[in-house]
Amino acid sequence: MYKSFLIKYAEIAIKGKNRYLFEDALVSQINHALKKAEGEFLVRKEQGRIYVDTLSDYDYDEVVEALKCVFGIVGICPVVLLEDEGFDKLAEEVIAYIDKVYPDKHFTFKVNARRARKNYPMESMEINAAMGEKILDAYPETKVDVHHPQVVFNIEIRAKINVYSTIIPGPGGMPVGTNGKAMLLLSGGIDSPVAGYMIAKRGVTIDATYFHAPPYTSERAKQKVVDLAKIVAKYSGPINLHVVNFTDIQLYIYEQCPHEELTIIMRRYMMKLAEHFAKENKCLGLITGESIGQVTSQTMQSLAATNEVCTMPVYRPLIGFDKQEIVTISEKIDAYETSILPYEDCCTIFVAKHPVTKPNLNVIHNDERKLSEKIDALMQEAIDTVEVIHIEG
Protein backbone atom coordinates (compact mmCIF):
# COMPACT_ATOMS: atom_id res chain seq x y z
CA MET A 1 0.00 0.00 0.00
CA TYR A 2 2.95 2.34 0.48
CA LYS A 3 4.07 4.31 -2.55
CA SER A 4 6.72 6.30 -0.68
CA PHE A 5 9.24 6.08 2.15
CA LEU A 6 10.24 9.05 4.27
CA ILE A 7 13.95 8.95 5.14
CA LYS A 8 14.97 10.46 8.46
CA TYR A 9 18.50 11.63 9.18
CA ALA A 10 20.05 13.24 12.26
CA GLU A 11 23.64 14.52 12.12
CA ILE A 12 23.24 15.92 8.62
CA ALA A 13 20.48 18.21 9.87
CA ILE A 14 22.89 20.13 12.11
CA LYS A 15 25.35 20.89 9.31
CA GLY A 16 25.63 24.51 8.23
CA LYS A 17 25.88 25.97 4.76
CA ASN A 18 27.30 22.73 3.34
CA ARG A 19 24.37 20.62 4.55
CA TYR A 20 23.23 20.16 0.96
CA LEU A 21 26.49 18.32 0.18
CA PHE A 22 25.73 15.72 2.84
CA GLU A 23 22.11 15.44 1.68
CA ASP A 24 23.26 14.95 -1.91
CA ALA A 25 25.72 12.28 -0.76
CA LEU A 26 22.93 10.51 1.12
CA VAL A 27 20.67 10.64 -1.95
CA SER A 28 23.50 9.13 -4.00
CA GLN A 29 24.05 6.33 -1.47
CA ILE A 30 20.31 5.57 -1.35
CA ASN A 31 20.17 5.35 -5.14
CA HIS A 32 23.14 2.98 -5.09
CA ALA A 33 21.57 0.79 -2.39
CA LEU A 34 18.25 0.56 -4.22
CA LYS A 35 19.97 -1.07 -7.19
CA LYS A 36 19.86 -4.24 -5.06
CA ALA A 37 16.04 -4.13 -4.97
CA GLU A 38 13.64 -4.98 -7.78
CA GLY A 39 11.62 -2.05 -9.09
CA GLU A 40 11.96 1.57 -10.15
CA PHE A 41 12.46 4.33 -7.59
CA LEU A 42 12.78 8.09 -7.45
CA VAL A 43 14.86 9.54 -4.62
CA ARG A 44 14.17 13.23 -4.04
CA LYS A 45 14.77 16.04 -1.57
CA GLU A 46 11.90 18.24 -0.47
CA GLN A 47 11.73 20.78 2.37
CA GLY A 48 14.54 19.26 4.41
CA ARG A 49 13.25 15.74 3.87
CA ILE A 50 14.35 12.88 1.62
CA TYR A 51 11.72 10.65 0.03
CA VAL A 52 11.93 7.39 -1.88
CA ASP A 53 8.98 7.17 -4.28
CA THR A 54 8.17 3.76 -5.78
CA LEU A 55 7.42 3.96 -9.50
CA SER A 56 6.59 0.29 -10.04
CA ASP A 57 5.81 -2.90 -8.16
CA TYR A 58 8.42 -3.62 -5.52
CA ASP A 59 9.26 -5.97 -2.66
CA TYR A 60 8.77 -4.10 0.62
CA ASP A 61 11.28 -6.20 2.58
CA GLU A 62 13.91 -5.84 -0.16
CA VAL A 63 13.63 -2.06 -0.12
CA VAL A 64 13.77 -1.84 3.67
CA GLU A 65 16.80 -4.17 3.89
CA ALA A 66 18.63 -2.11 1.25
CA LEU A 67 17.93 1.15 3.08
CA LYS A 68 18.99 -0.32 6.45
CA CYS A 69 22.54 -0.59 5.05
CA VAL A 70 22.83 3.12 4.17
CA PHE A 71 24.85 5.15 6.65
CA GLY A 72 23.29 8.52 7.39
CA ILE A 73 19.76 7.13 7.73
CA VAL A 74 18.35 6.99 11.26
CA GLY A 75 14.78 6.11 10.34
CA ILE A 76 12.86 4.56 7.43
CA CYS A 77 9.18 5.47 7.47
CA PRO A 78 6.65 3.89 5.08
CA VAL A 79 4.52 6.98 4.46
CA VAL A 80 1.20 7.93 2.88
CA LEU A 81 1.37 11.30 1.09
CA LEU A 82 -1.93 13.19 0.89
CA GLU A 83 -3.14 16.34 -0.81
CA ASP A 84 -4.49 18.99 1.56
CA GLU A 85 -8.26 18.80 1.11
CA GLY A 86 -9.22 19.97 4.58
CA PHE A 87 -9.22 18.34 8.00
CA ASP A 88 -12.32 16.17 7.50
CA LYS A 89 -10.83 14.59 4.37
CA LEU A 90 -7.54 14.09 6.21
CA ALA A 91 -9.38 12.32 9.04
CA GLU A 92 -11.08 10.01 6.51
CA GLU A 93 -7.69 9.12 5.04
CA VAL A 94 -6.19 8.45 8.47
CA ILE A 95 -9.12 6.14 9.35
CA ALA A 96 -8.65 4.32 6.02
CA TYR A 97 -4.92 4.03 6.79
CA ILE A 98 -5.64 2.49 10.21
CA ASP A 99 -8.08 0.02 8.62
CA LYS A 100 -5.39 -1.27 6.27
CA VAL A 101 -2.40 -1.26 8.62
CA TYR A 102 -3.98 -2.26 11.95
CA PRO A 103 -6.64 -4.97 11.54
CA ASP A 104 -6.65 -5.50 15.32
CA LYS A 105 -7.91 -2.24 16.80
CA HIS A 106 -7.11 -3.06 20.44
CA PHE A 107 -4.18 -0.69 20.93
CA THR A 108 -3.26 2.50 22.75
CA PHE A 109 -2.22 5.48 20.65
CA LYS A 110 -1.31 9.11 20.44
CA VAL A 111 -1.39 11.57 17.56
CA ASN A 112 1.80 13.54 16.94
CA ALA A 113 1.13 16.40 14.52
CA ARG A 114 3.80 18.72 13.19
CA ARG A 115 2.76 21.82 11.28
CA ALA A 116 5.77 22.58 9.07
CA ARG A 117 3.50 24.59 6.75
CA LYS A 118 2.42 27.46 8.97
CA ASN A 119 -0.54 28.57 6.83
CA TYR A 120 -2.48 25.44 7.79
CA PRO A 121 -5.57 26.68 9.68
CA MET A 122 -5.15 24.43 12.74
CA GLU A 123 -2.36 24.42 15.33
CA SER A 124 -0.47 21.17 15.99
CA MET A 125 -2.18 20.63 19.36
CA GLU A 126 -5.59 21.19 17.78
CA ILE A 127 -4.82 18.56 15.14
CA ASN A 128 -3.71 16.11 17.85
CA ALA A 129 -6.94 16.53 19.83
CA ALA A 130 -9.31 16.57 16.86
CA MET A 131 -7.70 13.57 15.14
CA GLY A 132 -7.64 11.65 18.42
CA GLU A 133 -11.40 12.18 18.74
CA LYS A 134 -11.97 10.97 15.17
CA ILE A 135 -9.98 7.78 15.83
CA LEU A 136 -11.79 7.11 19.11
CA ASP A 137 -15.17 7.64 17.42
CA ALA A 138 -14.26 5.21 14.63
CA TYR A 139 -12.65 2.63 16.92
CA PRO A 140 -14.04 2.79 20.49
CA GLU A 141 -11.88 -0.18 21.50
CA THR A 142 -8.74 1.98 21.16
CA LYS A 143 -7.43 4.17 23.98
CA VAL A 144 -5.34 7.31 24.11
CA ASP A 145 -2.02 7.07 25.98
CA VAL A 146 0.20 10.08 25.44
CA HIS A 147 3.06 8.74 27.60
CA HIS A 148 3.56 5.11 26.52
CA PRO A 149 1.42 4.52 23.42
CA GLN A 150 1.63 1.31 21.43
CA VAL A 151 1.12 3.27 18.20
CA VAL A 152 2.06 6.85 17.34
CA PHE A 153 0.27 8.36 14.36
CA ASN A 154 2.60 11.00 12.93
CA ILE A 155 1.00 13.71 10.82
CA GLU A 156 3.35 16.22 9.19
CA ILE A 157 1.72 19.16 7.43
CA ARG A 158 3.98 19.94 4.47
CA ALA A 159 3.45 20.59 0.76
CA LYS A 160 1.76 17.22 0.98
CA ILE A 161 0.54 15.82 4.27
CA ASN A 162 2.71 12.95 5.54
CA VAL A 163 1.00 10.20 7.53
CA TYR A 164 3.08 7.39 9.05
CA SER A 165 3.21 5.25 12.17
CA THR A 166 6.21 2.98 11.60
CA ILE A 167 9.81 4.11 12.02
CA ILE A 168 12.30 1.38 11.12
CA PRO A 169 15.73 2.16 12.64
CA GLY A 170 18.56 2.87 10.21
CA PRO A 171 22.28 2.50 10.96
CA GLY A 172 22.87 6.21 11.67
CA GLY A 173 26.24 7.82 11.05
CA MET A 174 27.26 9.88 8.04
CA PRO A 175 26.89 9.13 4.31
CA VAL A 176 29.87 7.21 2.95
CA GLY A 177 32.12 9.44 0.87
CA THR A 178 31.75 12.58 2.97
CA ASN A 179 34.88 12.10 5.10
CA GLY A 180 37.70 10.95 2.85
CA LYS A 181 39.20 7.51 2.26
CA ALA A 182 41.28 5.10 4.35
CA MET A 183 42.95 1.69 4.03
CA LEU A 184 41.66 -1.13 6.25
CA LEU A 185 44.02 -3.91 7.34
CA LEU A 186 41.56 -6.76 6.92
CA SER A 187 42.21 -10.19 8.42
CA GLY A 188 39.96 -13.19 8.78
CA GLY A 189 39.11 -12.40 12.40
CA ILE A 190 36.21 -10.75 14.18
CA ASP A 191 37.72 -7.33 14.82
CA SER A 192 38.88 -5.87 11.51
CA PRO A 193 35.55 -6.20 9.62
CA VAL A 194 33.86 -4.43 12.54
CA ALA A 195 36.52 -1.71 12.42
CA GLY A 196 35.79 -1.25 8.71
CA TYR A 197 32.08 -1.01 9.42
CA MET A 198 32.60 1.52 12.21
CA ILE A 199 34.89 3.81 10.22
CA ALA A 200 32.57 3.66 7.18
CA LYS A 201 29.75 4.71 9.52
CA ARG A 202 31.60 8.02 9.94
CA GLY A 203 31.42 8.66 6.21
CA VAL A 204 34.83 7.22 5.26
CA THR A 205 35.29 5.33 1.99
CA ILE A 206 37.51 2.28 2.44
CA ASP A 207 39.86 0.01 0.55
CA ALA A 208 41.48 -3.00 2.23
CA THR A 209 44.76 -4.90 2.47
CA TYR A 210 44.93 -8.60 3.37
CA PHE A 211 48.20 -10.45 4.07
CA HIS A 212 48.16 -13.96 2.61
CA ALA A 213 50.83 -16.55 3.49
CA PRO A 214 50.52 -19.60 1.23
CA PRO A 215 50.99 -22.50 1.78
CA TYR A 216 50.62 -21.78 5.51
CA THR A 217 47.29 -20.07 4.86
CA SER A 218 44.89 -21.76 2.47
CA GLU A 219 42.76 -20.52 -0.41
CA ARG A 220 39.79 -21.03 1.90
CA ALA A 221 41.34 -18.49 4.29
CA LYS A 222 41.66 -16.05 1.41
CA GLN A 223 38.06 -16.67 0.31
CA LYS A 224 36.94 -16.08 3.88
CA VAL A 225 38.50 -12.60 3.77
CA VAL A 226 36.89 -11.91 0.40
CA ASP A 227 33.53 -12.90 1.91
CA LEU A 228 34.14 -10.58 4.88
CA ALA A 229 35.01 -7.75 2.50
CA LYS A 230 31.68 -8.34 0.74
CA ILE A 231 29.85 -8.07 4.06
CA VAL A 232 31.58 -4.77 4.89
CA ALA A 233 30.95 -3.50 1.34
CA LYS A 234 27.18 -3.85 1.87
CA TYR A 235 27.57 -0.81 4.11
CA SER A 236 30.71 0.92 2.86
CA GLY A 237 30.21 0.62 -0.88
CA PRO A 238 32.82 -0.83 -3.28
CA ILE A 239 36.16 -1.98 -1.83
CA ASN A 240 39.42 -2.70 -3.64
CA LEU A 241 40.94 -5.60 -1.68
CA HIS A 242 44.74 -5.82 -1.98
CA VAL A 243 45.90 -9.41 -1.41
CA VAL A 244 49.59 -9.31 -0.48
CA ASN A 245 51.76 -12.44 -0.53
CA PHE A 246 53.53 -12.14 2.82
CA THR A 247 55.08 -15.62 3.04
CA ASP A 248 58.70 -14.84 2.14
CA ILE A 249 58.79 -11.75 4.36
CA GLN A 250 57.32 -13.69 7.26
CA LEU A 251 59.75 -16.60 6.86
CA TYR A 252 62.76 -14.29 6.62
CA ILE A 253 61.78 -12.40 9.78
CA TYR A 254 61.21 -15.74 11.52
CA GLU A 255 64.71 -16.88 10.55
CA GLN A 256 66.54 -13.66 11.45
CA CYS A 257 64.82 -12.15 14.49
CA PRO A 258 64.28 -13.20 18.12
CA HIS A 259 60.99 -15.06 18.30
CA GLU A 260 59.61 -13.01 21.17
CA GLU A 261 59.70 -9.98 18.84
CA LEU A 262 58.24 -11.72 15.78
CA THR A 263 54.72 -10.35 16.11
CA ILE A 264 55.80 -6.73 16.55
CA ILE A 265 58.34 -6.79 13.72
CA MET A 266 55.94 -8.56 11.34
CA ARG A 267 53.22 -6.05 12.13
CA ARG A 268 55.62 -3.16 11.48
CA TYR A 269 56.28 -4.50 7.99
CA MET A 270 52.57 -5.07 7.43
CA MET A 271 51.94 -1.44 8.33
CA LYS A 272 54.65 -0.31 5.91
CA LEU A 273 53.08 -2.29 3.07
CA ALA A 274 49.55 -1.18 3.92
CA GLU A 275 50.72 2.43 3.96
CA HIS A 276 52.30 1.99 0.53
CA PHE A 277 48.99 0.83 -0.94
CA ALA A 278 47.14 3.52 1.01
CA LYS A 279 49.24 6.27 -0.54
CA GLU A 280 48.94 4.66 -3.96
CA ASN A 281 45.15 4.79 -3.63
CA LYS A 282 44.98 8.34 -2.22
CA CYS A 283 43.92 7.21 1.26
CA LEU A 284 44.31 9.57 4.20
CA GLY A 285 45.03 6.96 6.86
CA LEU A 286 45.13 3.32 7.93
CA ILE A 287 42.41 1.46 9.87
CA THR A 288 43.01 -1.49 12.17
CA GLY A 289 40.79 -3.56 14.44
CA GLU A 290 43.09 -3.23 17.44
CA SER A 291 41.75 -2.76 20.97
CA ILE A 292 43.98 -1.88 23.91
CA GLY A 293 45.06 -4.92 25.87
CA GLN A 294 43.07 -7.49 23.90
CA VAL A 295 46.20 -9.46 22.91
CA THR A 296 49.93 -9.06 23.54
CA SER A 297 50.49 -7.11 20.31
CA GLN A 298 47.89 -4.56 21.40
CA THR A 299 49.42 -3.13 24.55
CA MET A 300 50.04 0.62 24.54
CA GLN A 301 53.76 -0.01 24.02
CA SER A 302 53.13 -2.45 21.15
CA LEU A 303 50.74 -0.07 19.40
CA ALA A 304 53.31 2.72 19.73
CA ALA A 305 55.92 0.44 18.16
CA THR A 306 53.74 -0.30 15.13
CA ASN A 307 52.73 3.36 14.83
CA GLU A 308 56.35 4.42 14.59
CA VAL A 309 56.80 3.11 11.04
CA CYS A 310 53.77 5.00 9.67
CA THR A 311 53.82 8.52 8.28
CA MET A 312 50.02 8.72 8.03
CA PRO A 313 47.44 8.48 10.82
CA VAL A 314 46.36 5.07 12.10
CA TYR A 315 42.68 4.97 13.06
CA ARG A 316 41.54 2.34 15.56
CA PRO A 317 37.75 2.66 15.92
CA LEU A 318 37.60 -0.28 18.38
CA ILE A 319 40.36 0.98 20.67
CA GLY A 320 38.17 1.17 23.79
CA PHE A 321 35.79 -1.71 23.04
CA ASP A 322 35.80 -4.98 24.93
CA LYS A 323 35.50 -8.25 23.01
CA GLN A 324 31.79 -8.78 23.68
CA GLU A 325 30.95 -5.32 22.35
CA ILE A 326 32.85 -6.13 19.16
CA VAL A 327 31.15 -9.53 18.84
CA THR A 328 27.73 -7.88 19.24
CA ILE A 329 28.40 -5.56 16.29
CA SER A 330 29.88 -8.44 14.27
CA GLU A 331 26.67 -10.41 14.79
CA LYS A 332 24.53 -7.38 13.92
CA ILE A 333 26.21 -6.98 10.52
CA ASP A 334 26.16 -10.75 9.86
CA ALA A 335 29.95 -11.06 9.87
CA TYR A 336 30.40 -13.20 12.99
CA GLU A 337 29.65 -16.64 11.53
CA THR A 338 32.10 -16.00 8.69
CA SER A 339 34.76 -14.58 11.02
CA ILE A 340 34.82 -17.70 13.20
CA LEU A 341 35.32 -20.16 10.33
CA PRO A 342 38.43 -22.18 11.30
CA TYR A 343 40.86 -21.00 8.61
CA GLU A 344 44.13 -19.53 9.90
CA ASP A 345 45.44 -16.20 8.70
CA CYS A 346 49.07 -15.10 8.67
CA CYS A 347 48.77 -13.48 12.12
CA THR A 348 48.08 -16.85 13.74
CA ILE A 349 51.09 -18.73 12.34
CA PHE A 350 54.68 -18.43 13.59
CA VAL A 351 53.36 -17.20 16.93
CA ALA A 352 55.96 -16.93 19.71
CA LYS A 353 55.33 -18.79 22.96
CA HIS A 354 56.27 -15.71 24.99
CA PRO A 355 55.84 -12.59 22.83
CA VAL A 356 57.16 -9.32 24.18
CA THR A 357 54.42 -7.04 25.55
CA LYS A 358 56.57 -3.95 26.15
CA PRO A 359 58.85 -3.79 23.12
CA ASN A 360 62.01 -1.70 23.39
CA LEU A 361 62.31 0.34 20.20
CA ASN A 362 66.12 0.39 20.34
CA VAL A 363 66.14 -3.41 20.40
CA ILE A 364 63.56 -3.56 17.59
CA HIS A 365 65.64 -1.18 15.46
CA ASN A 366 68.78 -3.27 15.98
CA ASP A 367 66.95 -6.47 15.03
CA GLU A 368 65.50 -4.86 11.91
CA ARG A 369 68.98 -3.73 10.83
CA LYS A 370 69.94 -7.42 10.70
CA LEU A 371 67.37 -7.91 7.97
CA SER A 372 69.59 -5.74 5.71
CA GLU A 373 68.76 -5.12 2.07
CA LYS A 374 67.10 -8.48 1.51
CA ILE A 375 63.94 -7.37 3.31
CA ASP A 376 63.66 -4.38 0.97
CA ALA A 377 63.77 -6.69 -2.04
CA LEU A 378 61.14 -8.96 -0.49
CA MET A 379 58.93 -5.95 0.25
CA GLN A 380 59.24 -4.76 -3.35
CA GLU A 381 58.35 -8.23 -4.61
CA ALA A 382 55.24 -8.21 -2.41
CA ILE A 383 54.27 -4.84 -3.88
CA ASP A 384 54.90 -5.97 -7.46
CA THR A 385 52.86 -9.18 -7.09
CA VAL A 386 49.87 -7.78 -5.20
CA GLU A 387 46.48 -9.06 -6.37
CA VAL A 388 43.66 -6.50 -6.36
CA ILE A 389 40.13 -7.88 -6.07
CA HIS A 390 37.28 -5.44 -6.67
CA ILE A 391 34.40 -6.02 -4.27
CA GLU A 392 31.09 -4.48 -5.31
CA GLY A 393 29.08 -2.73 -2.63
Question: Model-flagged regions — what are they?
Answer:
Residues 133-135, 172-179, 250-251, 256-333, ...:
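Active-site adenylate/phosphate-handling loop in enzymes that bind or generate adenylated species
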Residues 229-255, 345-346:
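A conserved beta-strand->alpha-helix junction
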Residues 341-393:
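The feature marks non-catalytic terminal segments
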